[in-house]
Amino acid sequence: MKKNPIKSDLRETTAGKVTFLFLLFLYTGVMLYLFWMECYQVPGFQSDMPDYVNKVAGIAGNYEFPYPILFWTARLSAWLIGAKAAMAVTTALFNLAAVIITKYYMNREIRKNSHYEILSHKKQVMTDIVVTLLVFALFLLSNLYSPKNTAFFGFDYAYRCMGIYTPNPFWNATYLATRPFAIICFFETVKVLSEY
C-alpha cells in the first residue's frame, strides 16, 4: 500500500509551519489591501482593475480578457459582496493559492532531492524556513519593475510590467490568476520529463 506523501514525506516542522502561515497571512493581507485599493480606484493605486470589475459586473468594456475562470470565480461572490470587493478577494485568493502550491512543490522537491529525513531537527527547521523564504522571494521578485533604460541581469526589462495605466507590478489580475495553474503545469512537466 502506497503511503500518502502529504502525511509522511511532506511533513514540516512546527516552526516551519508557523513561519509559513505567518508570512502567508502577511503577504495575503498586503495583496488584498493592494487589490482592494485598486478595485475601488483609490488615488495612488492606479491599475487595470476597474476594467476587471466592470467585466465581473457585466458592464461592456474595451478589452477582451482571455481567462474566464477569474471572472467566473469573482461572480460567485459578487452578488453578495459587490463586484469590486469580489474582484479584490478573488485575485487575492488566486495569489494565495499560487503561494501554497509553490510551497507544496518546493517542499516535495527538497525532500526528494536531499536527505531531509536524516537531518537533525534544527537543520530541518532551518530547511523549512529557508524554503518558505525562497517561496516568498520568488513571488516578490517575479514582479520586479525596472525603470526605463536600465538592464537587470543583462536584459532590458524597461516597462516589463507597465500594464495599461501604471508601473504597478501587480496590475494584471489575469496573470495573477493563472499563476497557480502555471506553477502546477511547470512542476508536473518537469516531473514527466525527468521520468521520460
What spans do the regions from the language model cover?
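Helix-to-loop transition at the C-terminal end of transmembrane segments
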Residues: 32-48, 144-150
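Short hydrophobic/aromatic helix or loop-helix immediately within or flanking a transmembrane segment
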Residues: 51-85
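Loop-to-helix entry region of an early transmembrane alpha helix in multi-pass inner-membrane enzymes
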Residues: 81-101, 105, 120-132, 171-176
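Transmembrane-helix motifs of polytopic, lipid-linked glycan transferases
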Residues: 89-118, 138, 144, 184
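Membrane-interface micro-motifs in multi-pass membrane enzymes
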Residues: 124-187
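Membrane-interface alpha helices of multi-pass inner-membrane proteins
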Residues: 188, 195-196
